Amino acid sequence: MTNNLSGYRNKIVRVKTSKKRPISSSNWLRRQLNDPYVAKARLEGFRSRAAYKLLEIHYKFRLFTPNMKIVDLGAAPGGWSQVASKLIKASDNNLNNKIISIDLLEIEPIVGVEFLQKDFFEKDTEELIIHNLEGKADIVMSDMASNTIGHKATDHMRTLLLCEQAFEFALKVLKPSCHFIAKIFRGGAETALLNKVKREFRTVKHFKPVSSRSESTEIYLVALNKK
């Protein structure tokens, strides 16, 4: 599991624009076909290129160790849960290693991962996660993002709201000295949230993985050592 992209950048795939296909769809398809991380994910068995973002976060901050309990919010299609499963050496028989993953969309089974197909915002979802976790969590991670509409300010605020909800949940379930990871889009309104996070965690960092597309405003909030 490395970020060596040798051999993934050599071939450019061109996409003809169909009369029936919107230009935006053609651009998305072209970007996917020519993205070295998409190709690398297919070859290495990861379900999405997002897997490499979490790997980079781990290699930078060394968050994951065996015998952890983890909550993955917005898990589909499962790339982050796959990475976490490998890093904590999860198995279906080891109750000390546990990953609870949640999303509205279904994901295929992953070793050591218990998946809940639920809306995180439903009233009973938090209680269900806490019940299934059987104790406090070591890491809460959220790659949740709202469906983008191309309006940066709106996309920023919608994803920031998801991050705030994930943060409030993390405060309830994390053990002391444990960690929270979440995606945000830069846009200026995140300062108030960052101040809240800094009051609850000893170290708070911004991190943009190399595997995050350069044109994207996404960054990751890495909050270490809950007080």
From Swiss-Prot:
Primary location: cytoplasm
Cellular compartments annotated: Cytoplasm
E.C. number: 2.1.1.166
Record-linked InterPro entries: RNA_methyltr_RlmE, RNA_MeTrfase_FtsJ_dom, rRNA-MeTfrase_E, SAM-dependent_MTases_sf
GO molecular function: rRNA (uridine-2'-O-)-methyltransferase activity
First-tier enzyme category under EC: transferase
Protein's UniProt keywords contain Transmembrane helix: no
Coiled-coil ranges per UniProt: none
An example Gene Ontology CC term for this record: cytoplasm
Reaction equations catalysed: uridine(2552) in 23S rRNA + S-adenosyl-L-methionine = 2'-O-methyluridine(2552) in 23S rRNA + S-adenosyl-L-homocysteine + H(+)
Keywords: Cytoplasm, Methyltransferase, rRNA processing, S-adenosyl-L-methionine, Transferase
Record's keyword annotation contains Cytoplasm: yes
Binding positions (S-adenosyl-L-methionine): 78, 80, 103, 119, 143
Superkingdom of this protein's organism: Bacteria
Annotated active site: 183
Classification via HAMAP family: RNA_methyltr_E (MF_01547)
Protein's job: Specifically methylates the uridine in position 2552 of 23S rRNA at the 2'-O position of the ribose in the fully assembled 50S ribosomal subunit.
Similarity comment: Belongs to the class I-like SAM-binding methyltransferase superfamily. RNA methyltransferase RlmE family.
This protein's name: Ribosomal RNA large subunit methyltransferase E
Naturally occurring in which organism (per UniProt): Rickettsia prowazekii (strain Madrid E)
